[in-house]
Amino acid sequence: MARPYICLLALAAMLLLGIATISRSRGLRDKAHQSAPRIPSQFSQEERVAMKEALKGAIQIPTVSFSPKELNTTALAEFGEYIRKVFPTVFKTSFIRHEVVGEYSHLFTVHGSDPSLQPYMLLAHIDVVPAPDEGWDVPPFSGLERNGFIYGRGTIDNKNSLMGILQALELLLIRNYIPRRSFFIALGHDEEVMGVNGAQKISALLQARGVQLAFIVDEGSFIFDGFIPGLKNPFAMVAVSQKGLINLMLQVNTTPGHSSAPPKETSIGILAAAVNRLEQTPMPNMFGDGPMKMALQELANEFSFPTNLFLSNMWLFRPLVSRLMERNYITNALVRTTTALTMFNSGIKVNVIPAVAQAIVDFRIHPAQTVQEVHVLATQTADTIRTSPLASTCSTPSTCSHRASASCMESMRESQSKPTRGK
């Protein structure tokens, strides 16, 4: 169940568009970059209420993507009108260019005062996956608030980011903010179904214009609270790479029959055994010298003894930390390629033994592995002698760009410099 903190929009505003944050130093962090906020970051009670209501309203618009050719276009059009109403300053500011791309996606170009600086891009998406009413405490498109949480499809994926970005820009503009560095805001309408008419068309448009970006900030990770045992405070995990994926279809073909005289093995039984092997044989743990290790080292002083000792001396305790990361399903996903059986299809009648059984397994590929490597391991584990791997959707994991990270840090430091104020 998606249950983000109500103040997530405010936090997104501060993090994404540079309303200065003041971090607590324990002696391990450089204090040189800590300074007074360039623009006051306090929100009035009226603004806080408006943030909540804006997110609730966005959740109530059922912008569902079922397939690349089956979208709720009525809701997508309604959402376009909704953001115009909720964020009027964004749409009327002279140095912001707004374009509709692919009918329902939105591209904002925010022109900065220094054109020599390379621009960056903030990403979010409008569409959500289908949400059957079953399993929800409240209707999935109600946007209801209970006990400090807002419920509904899109509260985490990904209308929280979308509304947070636009809310941040709206509030900054009201405070007479003009950025030094130009940036883009791209809001796709079909991200959940591969983004063919949204993200891909926005990308093609910017490529045709010769735009080169310093870095991109996408929907990223969550605010973790209680997921890592021993961590005393909530923390925001900044994702610096993107997992790849393979949606691998497995199929078993056998001779059909009648349930009154079943064979020793059936298509369903053979396939069930294959996917069970995949679930019981996880991909290798890739915890090593990458950003996950660096993040834990930075968090070391937030833990009590002896965890802080382990994390501060990773050269000695890395194998132990690696095993501990596997024990929690959230942190386990950070150290390996994950395996998730998401679809299983077979059978037409209760007394007929089906000839065909199909399953789709979703692998989210760790950046330290390749699509080919995961495909080989998966097919070997699934026993391809009796289980045929068929067509699959895949995308390559992104690499960690040190240059992009440096540009991102430079931009964050710019946000703490002397403000440029406009009319």
Please identify what each model-predicted range represents:
Residues 4-7, 11-153, 172-181:
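Acidic/His- and Gly-rich active-site-bordering loop/insert found
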Residues 27-36, 206-214, 221-233, 238-247, ...:
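Acidic-enriched catalytic cores of C-N bond-cleaving enzymes acting on peptides and small amides
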Residues 149-152, 156-237:
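Acidic/histidine-rich catalytic neighborhood of metal-dependent amide-processing enzymes
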Residues 380-383, 389-423:
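Zn-dependent metallopeptidase/amidohydrolase metal-coordination segment
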